[in-house]
């Protein structure tokens, strides 16, 4: 009999409505879990693999020694390298192209590079209007490296204990 009184009291007090309203107010005042993307950006992992870049030494010399390990290990065959010897006996690239339409962003090129010349940087916003813009030349890759060098160096330093 007491159970019927409790059930009737909950019915007349609109207990289910009050519980639902309280739950709605809880989420109304809580911080939003979503980001307003173009204006707000979430954090990226130091291991994030984005747009490719070629790095230079602090002296300004290109890091790439034209060993062609990245070209050999690329499963998509997206990298093309031509090299020639210099006067001091070392090799330097004359052509370093990446076909981004073929690239699968596996990161093997970055792992294979003995001098950390080719890296996948933190930039993920590189949509283009034409397909030709996705064929990266050596100049474009060096420009990306110059633009993102500080962040790339920080990410490599943070990832160093795991390499």
Curated annotation (Swiss-Prot):
Keywords: 4Fe-4S, Cell inner membrane, Cell membrane, Iron, Iron-sulfur, Membrane, Metal-binding, NAD, Quinone, Repeat, Translocase, Ubiquinone. [4Fe-4S] cluster 2 binds at residues 74, 103, 106, 109. [4Fe-4S] cluster 1 binds at residues 64, 67, 70, 113. It is an enzyme of class 7 (translocase). The keyword Protease does not apply. Its cofactor is [4Fe-4S] cluster. GO terms for biological process: aerobic respiration. GO terms for molecular function: 4 iron, 4 sulfur cluster binding; iron ion binding; NADH:ubiquinone reductase (non-electrogenic) activity; quinone binding. It catalyses: a quinone + NADH + 5 H(+)(in) = a quinol + NAD(+) + 4 H(+)(out). It is a peripheral membrane protein. InterPro entries: 4Fe4S_Fe-S-bd, 4Fe4S_Fe_S_CS, NADH_quinone_OxRdtase_chainI. It is found in: Cell inner membrane. Its main location: membrane. Pfam families: Fer4_7 (PF12838). Residues 55-84, 94-123 form the 4Fe-4S ferredoxin-type domain. GO terms for cellular component: plasma membrane. Binds 2 [4Fe-4S] clusters per subunit. PANTHER family: NADH DEHYDROGENASE [UBIQUINONE] IRON-SULFUR PROTEIN 8, MITOCHONDRIAL, NADH DEHYDROGENASE UBIQUINONE IRON-SULFUR PROTEIN 8, MITOCHONDRIAL. NDH-1 is composed of 14 different subunits. Subunits NuoA, H, J, K, L, M, N constitute the membrane sector of the complex. NCBIfam families: NuoI, PRK05888.1-4, PRK05888.1-5. NDH-1 shuttles electrons from NADH, via FMN and iron-sulfur (Fe-S) centers, to quinones in the respiratory chain. The immediate electron acceptor for the enzyme in this species is believed to be ubiquinone. Couples the redox reaction to proton translocation (for every two electrons transferred, four hydrogen ions are translocated across the cytoplasmic membrane), and thus conserves the redox energy in a proton gradient. Belongs to the complex I 23 kDa subunit family. This is NADH-quinone oxidoreductase subunit I.
């Amino acid at each position: 009999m007491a159970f019927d009184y409790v059930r009737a009291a909950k019915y007349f007090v609109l207990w289910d409505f009050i519980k639902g309203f309280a739950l709605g107010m809880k989420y109304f005042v809580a911080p939003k879990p979503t980001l307003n993307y173009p204006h707000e950006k979430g954090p990226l992992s130091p291991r994030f693999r984005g747009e490719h870049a070629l790095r230079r030494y602090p002296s300004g010399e290109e890091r790439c020694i034209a060993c062609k390990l990245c070209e050999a290990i690329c499963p998509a065959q997206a990298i093309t390298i031509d090299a020639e010897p210099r006067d001091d006996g070392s090799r330097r690239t004359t052509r370093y192209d990446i076909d981004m339409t073929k690239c699968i962003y596996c990161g093997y090129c970055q792992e294979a590079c003995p001098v950390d010349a080719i890296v996948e940087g933190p930039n993920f916003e590189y949509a283009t209007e034409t397909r030709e813009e996705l064929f990266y030349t050596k100049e474009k890759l060096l420009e990306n490296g110059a633009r993102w060098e500080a962040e790339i160096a920080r990410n490599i330093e943070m990832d160093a204990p795991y390499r």
